[in-house]
């Protein structure tokens, strides 16, 4: 976009995939469960997490009444940036979410102070 995009134009950057919100939550929970299964030290660092007691992170999901105008899914059409500028994503949604989760698990000192007391 910086080198080939036109000034004043808008480009959606994405992977041309669509997920509903609940599927994203399930994916995140499943990835968290896999981390706890693979790394026993996480149970010591996060003793209140479901994975610490052998439960699934999905146990934390609570269904509530939707707010008016609730978006049940989000989609980005990146065809313009792909066609005009040759953009191609380097990550799938799944690998990007996995890398994000791994970053948070590796950088507890950054996010822990942000939690409410």
Sequence positions of predicted segments:
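C-terminal substrate-binding subdomain of Rossmann-fold SDR/epimerase-dehydratase oxidoreductases
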Residues: 1-117
């Amino acid at each position: 976009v910086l080198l080939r995009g036109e000034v004043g134009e808008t480009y959606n950057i994405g992977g041309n995939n669509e997920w509903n919100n609940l599927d994203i939550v399930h994916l995140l929970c499943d990835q968290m469960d896999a981390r706890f299964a693979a790394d026993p030290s996480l149970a010591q660092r996060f003793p209140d997490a479901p994975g610490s007691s052998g439960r699934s992170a999905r146990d934390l999901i609570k269904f509530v009444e939707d707010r008016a105008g609730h978006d049940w899914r989000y989609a980005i059409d990146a065809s313009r940036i792909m066609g005009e500028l040759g953009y191609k994503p380097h990550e799938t949604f799944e690998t990007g979410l996995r890398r994000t989760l791994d970053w948070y698990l590796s950088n507890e000192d950054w996010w822990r102070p942000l939690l409410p007391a």
